Amino acid sequence: MAVVTGIAAAGFTFSGATPALAEYEIEESRVEKGEAEIEYRGAVHFGIKKGEDDDDGDGDDEVGGVFEEDEEAPLRQSHDFEFEYGITERFKLSTSLITGEPITDSYGVDGVEIEFLYELIEREGEGWGLAAGGGYGFGVRNGEADEIEFGLITEYQTGLLLLIFNGLFEGQVGDNAETDGLGFGYGWRAEYEVVPHWGIGVEMFGEIEDLSHSGPWEEQEHSIGPTIFWKPGDDDDDEDEFDLDEDFVPGGPAEMELTFNVGVQFGLTDETSDSALKFQGKLEF
C-alpha cells in the first residue's frame, strides 16, 4: 500500500526557542469525520544556540547568564500532548498541552493551543491534497506572548513517495508581544516507503520571527535531518497489521491504528540548537 501521511497536528515552532506553540510538527491535509487522534511529540536538544554561547567555549554550565531579560532561552527538551477530532468530513479541531524545559528555567507548561483545519482538496491515493489551518496559542510561562497562526498545508503523493509542505504565518498578541509584524514558519517532509510499514525520509523546519525585520540567514532558525517511520497498522491487506476493527470490537470504532517516527535534526544556523532527537507517536480511533 502506498505510504500514508505521518504524524500530524496543526501549527509548529522550532528548535532553540521557548515556544508558546508546539515544536517539530508537520500537518497532514486529511480530515475524516468522527476520527479521534491522541498524539505525543517529544524532543531533546543537544548544544545551545551557537550564537548565544559565551566566548570561553567551555559550554553549558552558566548558559543562562548570556540572555537578556526579554529574550527567549533555548530548550533542553519539549514534550507535547495533543487531541484531535474530525467534526465533519472537512473540518477538525484540536487542542494541545505544550511543555518544555528551557535552559534558564525548570520543566513546566509553556502553553495551550486550540487549532482548526479545513480540508480544501481531498487527496485520494496519488495526487494533491490541500488544507487551510489556523490556531491560537496561550502562553503560560512567565513573559510568554500569546500567538496566532494561519496558513496552508500541501501534500503530494506519487507511488511510494509522499511530499508534505506546511507554511504558516505567525503573530504575537497580548501584553507580552515583542514583535508587531508577522513571522513565518515552515516544515516539509519527503517520505519514502521502503518496505510495508517502514519508511525513511528527510524533514526540515525553519522560522523567521519577523518578516519585516528578517535579518540574515544566520539570525534565523533552520534545521534538517533524517527520520524513520513505522506504521504497523498501515496496510489493510496485511493479516498481521496492528489494527482493531468492528469485527473485533462490536459497536466500537471502525479502526484503531498506531504510527510512530523518530528523527534527528541538525541546526543549520547559529540561532538553532546544534542537534535534536525528535520522536512522535499517534493513536487514531
What is the predicted function of each stretch?
Residues A2, A10, E23-I26:
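Low-complexity intrinsically disordered segments
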Residues T5-P19:
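C-terminal segment of classical bacterial N-terminal signal peptides
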Residues T18-F285:
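Transmembrane beta-barrel domains of Gram-negative outer membranes and organellar outer membranes
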